[in-house]
């Protein structure tokens, strides 16, 4: 769950310090263009080019020297004394620094260093494949290289969104259109399997075998978690939600809004892969509550959801949709939102054990588990339209 930067302010070369993100856009500005409603992609992704690899390891506790070595490889024409840097501190999976020369940041390299033991949570080779796949469909920035413990990629112009922004109809329409576009990326004609159950089972196994003895009393017992995981798989697998290519981690700051071009793009593809359509949407709806100060009173109301889902389905189908189709997806999404709570709660328990990032992962896990049990009766009672 790394979160992206907004544009850094110019600053002295070769120094890192904490900054407050600087907004890059005017929220009163109307979009110049809306994403096309016809978002279908042709079967089979274009062939991706090979990605450069450098045998450099960047010290996560002292990122700058390693980042500058990478910049010498990627931008040899940049004079070292002119390189400006900014470290971003919002991420809760990885560490991120931007390197650039010009104030307008038209050419800016982001250096991302993987978090401690995140290989337990993320398939890094798969992440690179996803990055290339999305780039081939014009849904991702350029991937410049990988290195021993991270990767470098293009800075995407725009502003990272906050919870208050994704509730704005003009913006959530753009988000729905972009998600519909990504969901139409095909798997080379093969029948993809959802990654949800495999990943959740792996996370649960880690919690059970490596973390269980030290679990807080505020966390449900392992036996309860095992029972709930089985219940989720049994009930959600029956909903017939289509398996599509999903982002799977669409929190606010993974959405970049470009007010000049009038579109949004998604970043951070660590958890991307083929999964249930309704999981990706339900997970995004959960993120309306935020991450640092979680408030589930901000979970989108039924009418907001129906409008969002209408935009999504219309973009996906390229034609008018019926109220029944929207209602069907509404039920699926709110049931799969339960799986989202469970997934990220398990994830947070693992991060709490291994991560060196300054974030209260245990508190976050407890919040997600509590919300899971709170909304489970209501979500379970939802019925598919006849």
UniProtKB/Swiss-Prot annotation:
Q: In which tissues is it expressed?
A: Expressed in kidney, liver, ovary, testis and prostate.
SUPFAM superfamilies from the xrefs?
Answer: Protein kinase-like (PK-like)
E.C. code: 2.7.1.82
Keywords assigned by UniProt? Answer: ATP-binding, Kinase, Lipid biosynthesis, Lipid metabolism, Nucleotide-binding, Phospholipid biosynthesis, Phospholipid metabolism, Transferase
Q: What is the lineage of its organism?
A: Eukaryota, Metazoa, Chordata, Craniata, Vertebrata
One Pfam annotation reads Choline_kinase
What residue ranges are annotated as transmembrane?
Answer: none
Pathway involvement? Phospholipid metabolism; phosphatidylethanolamine biosynthesis; phosphatidylethanolamine from ethanolamine: step 1/3
Give the gene name.
ETNK2
Reactions the enzyme catalyzes = ethanolamine + ATP = phosphoethanolamine + ADP + H(+)
Q: What is this protein called?
A: Ethanolamine kinase 2
């Amino acid at each position: 769950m790394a979160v992206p930067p907004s544009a850094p302010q110019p600053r002295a070369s070769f120094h890192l310090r904490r900054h407050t993100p600087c907004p890059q856009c005017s929220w009163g500005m109307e979009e110049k263009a809306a994403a096309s409603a016809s978002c279908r992609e042709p079967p089979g992704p274009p062939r991706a080019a090979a990605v450069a690899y450098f045998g450099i390891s960047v010290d996560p506790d002292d990122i700058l020297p390693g980042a500058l070595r990478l910049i010498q490889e990627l931008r040899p024409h940049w004079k070292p004394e002119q390189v400006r840097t900014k470290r971003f501190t919002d991420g809760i999976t990885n560490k991120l620094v931007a390197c650039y020369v010009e104030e307008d940041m038209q050419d800016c390299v982001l250096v991302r260093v993987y978090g401690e033991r995140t290989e337990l949570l993320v398939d890094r080779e798969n992440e690179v494949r996803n990055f290339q796949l999305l780039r081939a469909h014009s849904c991702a920035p350029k991937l410049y290289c990988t290195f021993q413990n991270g990767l470098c990629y293009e800075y995407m112009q725009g502003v990272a969104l906050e919870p208050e922004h994704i509730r704005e109809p003009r913006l959530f329409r753009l988000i729905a259109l972009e998600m519909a576009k990504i969901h139409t990326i095909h798997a080379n004609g093969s029948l993809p399997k959802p990654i949800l159950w495999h990943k959740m089972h792996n996370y649960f196994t880690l919690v059970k075998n490596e973390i269980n003895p030290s679990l807080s009393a505020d966390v449900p017992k392992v036996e309860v978690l095992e029972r709930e995981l089985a219940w989720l798989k049994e009930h959600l697998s029956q909903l017939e939600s289509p398996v599509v290519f999903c982002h799977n981690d669409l929190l606010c700051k993974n959405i970049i809004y470009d007010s000049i071009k009038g579109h949004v793009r998604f970043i951070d593809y660590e958890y991307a892969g083929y999964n249930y359509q309704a999981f990706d949407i339900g997970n995004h709806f959960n993120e309306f509550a935020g991450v640092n100060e979680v408030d589930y009173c901000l979970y989108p109301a039924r009418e907001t959801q129906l409008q969002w889902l209408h935009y999504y389905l219309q973009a996906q189908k390229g034609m008018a949709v019926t109220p029944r189709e929207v209602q069907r997806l509404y039920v699926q999404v709110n049931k799969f939102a339960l799986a989202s709570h469970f997934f990220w709660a398990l994830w947070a328990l693992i991060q709490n054990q291994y991560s060196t990032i300054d974030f209260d992962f245990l508190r976050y896990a407890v919040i997600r588990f509590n919300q899971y049990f709170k909304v489970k009766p209501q979500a379970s009672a939802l019925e598919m339209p006849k």
